[in-house]
């Protein structure tokens, strides 16, 4: 499954994995998964977190290692119900629910994920996605960026 990923995607997922793997031991625990999900405004129960881990925990050790994480991401990318996932992701970024992601909202979510970005980097991310040039990202622009990955 993970064989279909490009080197660039694998590098991106490695970076995402390290955001989850707070103590850097190469495994994501339910506690670490919960921390990241809560920073994104989600509030999963302990049982839901365990289910998420069990879903991809191939060796049954109760944690997710990087190869298991890659398989999960490869599966998610193939998933046909990605429309709903994109809407959900957009809602996470669009804090005030006005239908647009502003630079401030993007910075807020990225900071919660542990990404320390300069104002220039945030502005650059907005510019890359902002097709109509209004300084913020609407849903269509967001989908284009996410699908291009």
Curated annotation (Swiss-Prot):
Positions carrying N-acetylalanine: 2
Post-translational modification: The N-terminus is blocked.
EF-hand domain: residues covered: 8-43, 44-79, 81-116, 117-149
Annotated Gene Ontology cellular component terms: cytoplasm; myosin II complex
Family matches, as Pfam families: EF-hand_7 (PF13499)
The entry's keywords: Acetylation, Calcium, Metal-binding, Methylation, Repeat
UniProt: Ca(2+) 4 binding residues: 130, 132, 134, 136, 141
SMART domains from the UniProt entry: EFh
GO MF term (any one): calcium ion binding
Signal sequence segment: none
Chain sites annotated for binding Ca(2+) 2: 57, 59, 61, 63, 68
Its job: Calmodulin mediates the control of a large number of enzymes, ion channels and other proteins by Ca(2+). Among the enzymes to be stimulated by the calmodulin-Ca(2+) complex are a number of protein kinases and phosphatases.
Listed name of the protein: Calmodulin
UniProt organism field: Spinacia oleracea (Spinach)
Lineage: Eukaryota, Viridiplantae, Streptophyta, Embryophyta, Tracheophyta
């Amino acid at each position: 499954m993970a064989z279909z990923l490009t080197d660039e995607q694998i590098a991106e997922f490695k970076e995402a994995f390290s955001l989850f793997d707070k103590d850097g031991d190469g495994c994501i625990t339910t506690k670490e998964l919960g921390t990241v999900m809560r920073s994104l405004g989600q509030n999963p129960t302990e049982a839901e977190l365990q289910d998420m881990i069990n879903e991809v925990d191939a060796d049954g050790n109760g944690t997710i290692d990087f190869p298991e994480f890659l398989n999960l991401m490869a599966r998610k990318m193939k998933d046909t119900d990605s429309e709903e996932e994109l809407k959900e992701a957009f809602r996470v970024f669009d804090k005030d629910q006005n239908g647009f992601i502003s630079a401030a909202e993007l910075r807020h979510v990225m900071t919660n994920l542990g990404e320390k970005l300069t104002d220039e980097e945030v502005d650059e991310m907005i510019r890359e996605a902002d097709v109509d040039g209004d300084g913020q990202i609407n849903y269509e622009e967001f989908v284009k960026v996410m699908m291009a990955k």
